[in-house]
Regions:
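Short aromatic/hydrophobic "clamp" motif used to bind/position activated sugar donors
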Residues: 88
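Glycine-rich, basic loop-to-helix element that forms the pyrophosphate-binding segment
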Residues: 66-83
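Cell-envelope/extracellular polymer assembly enzymes that use nucleotide-activated donors
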Residues: 6-8, 37, 181
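Conserved donor NDP-sugar-binding/catalytic core segment of glycosyltransferases
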Residues: 100-132
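Short, well-formed alpha-helical segments that are part of the catalytic scaffolds
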Residues: 16-29
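C-terminal subregions of glycosyltransferases and related glycan-biosynthesis enzymes
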Residues: 196-311
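Conserved nucleotide-sugar donor-binding catalytic segment
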Residues: 134-213
Length: 311
């Protein structure tokens, strides 16, 4: 596969010594693969010694350690800056690449428009279900399409290396990534190419999945901070391209503030209710019921496909 670009895989690692072996094994399993480098970033894990033991079984991997936990974006950015590849991807330490990933990647590369700095590869969960709203779609997603969530879902982000090393993730200091803030910043430069190829197996049942326990006070606090930062930076963009999505963000903020024990619950709800009156009824119910009941109701709704599971 000499015609393939060099490929960097960045794996942020925080207390994942029990899952990262499967992740790294999936990367190195194909015998015929592109020239590549793999960077694991230990983000101040409490199981750092066990992590080092696992990584040591893969001599090709470079391990970089943070002295203390700095959050997902900081870990990603440390790995990105250290990467060397023409293409850089971020692979979570509880996910895996598909068995034939070099062939899939080559097909993706051949269709990746030169004007796009980012490419979204498709994913499926461990049950084999696609995690994208439109699994067969292939093409460019511009800023308006992203803000309106036209192609919502869980994807594997891939970047042109020189671009992302110069413009890495926007880090607001949270443990979670608040990825929308970064994607909107990147979309101001170029559209994102969406590939119909599936490259990643997403373990949405993992105990480390960001969607789990999303209304625990600590996670709700971070979710609230993400939404507040997104609204502070991009409310005008949402108002112009997707006013309903702007209203829905205010409603989400009300729910997160309630779960985090924060003030400003009903003021956020009121701002969302004006633009999404029907959804505001459900949001008000969630606020009144509280996080425990809300989490159970949302889980049932997802299982019944009444609300989206990804994106």
């Amino acid at each position: 596969l000499s015609d393939m670009p060099t490929f960097s895989v960045v794996v942020p690692a925080y207390n994942v010594s029990t899952t990262i072996d499967a992740t790294l094994a999936s990367v190195f399993a194909p015998a015929d693969r592109t020239a590549m480098d793999v960077v694991v970033v230990d983000d101040g894990s409490s199981d750092g010694a066990a992590l080092r033991d696992v990584v040591a079984t893969y001599p090709e991997v470079r391990l970089i350690a943070h002295e203390h936990n700095r959050g997902m974006c900081a870990a990603r950015n440390t790995g990105i800056v250290a990467s060397r590849g023409d293409v850089v991807t971020i692979l979570d330490a509880d996910d895996t690449l598909v068995a034939d990933w070099p062939d899939v990647f080559l097909r993706m590369w051949s269709k990746w428009p030169v004007e796009a700095n980012l490419c979204f590869a498709g994913c499926r969960n461990t049950a084999g279900t696609p995690t994208m709203r439109h699994p067969g779609f292939e093409g460019l997603m511009d800023l308006a399409a992203f803000i309106s969530e036209r192609y919502a879902g869980e994807y594997l982000p891939m970047f042109r290396g020189d671009y992302v090393r110069a413009k890495p993730y926007v880090d607001i200091g949270t443990r979670k990534s608040c990825g929308n803030i970064s994607y909107i910043a990147w979309l101001h430069d170029t559209a994102i190419h969406i590939s119909a190829e599936v490259l990643r197996i997403y373990d949405d049942e993992s105990s480390n999945a960001v969607s789990r326990d999303w209304l625990k006070p600590s996670k709700a606090e971070e979710n609230a901070r993400c939404v507040e930062e997104e609204l502070g930076r991009y409310a005008e963009l949402f108002a112009r391209h997707a006013p309903r999505k702007l209203a829905e963000r205010w409603l989400k903020l009300a729910i997160y503030r309630r779960a985090a024990g924060r003030a400003g619950v009903w003021s956020a709800w009121a701002r969302g209710a004006r633009g999404a009156p029907l959804r505001s009824v459900a949001a008000a119910l969630m606020v009144v019921l509280g996080p425990k009941a809300t989490s159970g109701l949302v889980g049932l709704a997802r299982a019944a496909n009444m609300v989206k599971r990804y994106g």
